[in-house]
């Protein structure tokens, strides 16, 4: 399914990007907000609150992308990670090149996050990092509760890896 998710992402990237920038315009004073923290820490809740407080800001969220894949059902979330990550890259490339302000709701579990911050700084974005911390037991319990309510499964190994790597990469 990973190859299918990548193929789907590549063939539909324009539609996904259009949804990200819908209603927004490039900004004279560009803002880049990077979210970090483990699954279940509350990143999306903080990002959503920021989006509501700020005007003219694009939200880039792999979870939103993943939910729009035709075969996605929540329990198979890891099968769509590659495609969703590719859409994050496409969207980030686009907003950086065109000068849109944005919130990037991801973890810093991969080293590419540092590169993305550097890219924003080089393009004169006012750049902020929000690190949302939650006790790992509480975050894991929230992740399991979210799986029941939303159907989105996060494998325990991925949770542990994201928790450790997001802290190390920040």
What are these regions (language model features)?
Residues 50-100:
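Conserved substrate/cofactor phosphate-moiety recognition/catalytic segment
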Residues 141-170:
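Conserved GTP-binding G-domain of TRAFAC-class P-loop NTPases and closely related GTPase folds
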Residues 1-25:
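N-terminal pre-Walker A segment at the start of P-loop NTPase domains
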Residues 38-39:
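The conserved Walker
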Residues 46:
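Hydrophobic positions on the alpha1 helix immediately C-terminal to the Walker A/P-loop
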